[in-house]
């Protein structure tokens, strides 16, 4: 299963693609879509949508996992972040992909084992889990963490489904 993890942001939207093969997680790609703050906000949203649409077309993930961000420095930041999340979600839904949302605490719990882990701990664990030569850039690392969270959650959900 190919999973696209997304860490939405109005300036940088991180993406991370992993492949889950049995119990193995394999790194496929990661990076970030950068928008120019000098541009009008609708143009920035369009860049996020278009960039993620191109990534989806290239890697053909089976599922998308998005970080559900609920904290922001101020109301305006929260609104912009919500709109960036919307652009990311629409890019996935537009081509029929299922979208799953995870809180930062759920992501940290799945990757490190505690929902109160520090960012550096999460980054080091991602490096180890995916056998990366170095720690990924921050937004990409967060997106890889979201993808790993979904990989773990999907496995647990499948077990519970089979129990019923």
Swiss-Prot record:
Annotated residues that bind Mg(2+) 1 are located at 7, 139
Q: Cofactor: bound how, per the entry note?
A: Binds 2 Mg(2+) ion per subunit.
Q: What is this protein called?
A: Crossover junction endodeoxyribonuclease RuvC
What domain of life? Bacteria
Q: Write the Enzyme Commission number(s) for this entry.
A: 3.1.21.10
Enzyme active site: 7, 67, 139
- Taxonomic source organism: Citrifermentans bemidjiense (strain ATCC BAA-1014 / DSM 16622 / JCM 12645 / Bem) (Geobacter bemidjiensis)
Keyword hit for Ribosomal protein:
no
| PANTHER family in alphabetical order | CROSSOVER JUNCTION ENDODEOXYRIBONUCLEASE RUVC
> Member of which family?
Belongs to the RuvC family.
GO BP annotations, alphabetical order: DNA recombination; DNA repair
Q: Name one GO molecular function term.
A: magnesium ion binding
Q: May I have one GO cellular component term?
A: cytoplasm
Kindly list the positions annotated as binding Mg(2+) 2. 67
What keywords are assigned to this protein?
Cytoplasm, DNA damage, DNA recombination, DNA repair, DNA-binding, Endonuclease, Hydrolase, Magnesium, Metal-binding, Nuclease
Cross-referenced PROSITE patterns: RUVC
Q: Report the protein's function.
A: The RuvA-RuvB-RuvC complex processes Holliday junction (HJ) DNA during genetic recombination and DNA repair. Endonuclease that resolves HJ intermediates. Cleaves cruciform DNA by making single-stranded nicks across the HJ at symmetrical positions within the homologous arms, yielding a 5'-phosphate and a 3'-hydroxyl group; requires a central core of homology in the junction. The consensus cleavage sequence is 5'-(A/T)TT(C/G)-3'. Cleavage occurs on the 3'-side of the TT dinucleotide at the point of strand exchange.
The top EC class, named as a word, is hydrolase
Record text on subunit structure and interactions: Homodimer which binds Holliday junction (HJ) DNA. The HJ becomes 2-fold symmetrical on binding to RuvC with unstacked arms; it has a different conformation from HJ DNA in complex with RuvA. In the full resolvosome a probable DNA-RuvA(4)-RuvB(12)-RuvC(2) complex forms which resolves the HJ.
Q: Where in the cell is it found?
A: Cytoplasm
Q: Which reaction does it catalyse?
A: Endonucleolytic cleavage at a junction such as a reciprocal single-stranded crossover between two homologous DNA duplexes (Holliday junction)
Chief localization: cytoplasm
């Amino acid at each position: 299963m190919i999973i696209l993890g997304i860490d939405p942001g109005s300036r940088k939207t991180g993406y991370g693609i992993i492949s889950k093969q049995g119990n193995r997680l394999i790194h496929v790609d990661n990076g970030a879509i950068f928008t120019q703050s000098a541009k009008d906000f609708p143009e920035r949203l369009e860049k996020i949508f278009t960039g993620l649409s191109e990534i989806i077309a290239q890697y053909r993930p089976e599922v998308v996992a998005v970080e559900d961000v609920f904290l922001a420095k101020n109301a305006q930041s929260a609104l912009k972040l919500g709109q960036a999340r919307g652009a990311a979600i629409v890019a996935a839904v537009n081509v029929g992909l299922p979208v799953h949302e995870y809180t930062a605490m759920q992501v940290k719990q799945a990757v490190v084992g505690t929902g109160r882990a520090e960012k550096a701990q999460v980054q080091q664990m991602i490096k180890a889990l995916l056998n990366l030569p170095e720690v990924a850039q921050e937004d990409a690392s967060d997106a890889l963490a979201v993808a790993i969270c979904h990989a773990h959650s999907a496995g647990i959900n499948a077990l519970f489904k089979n129990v019923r």
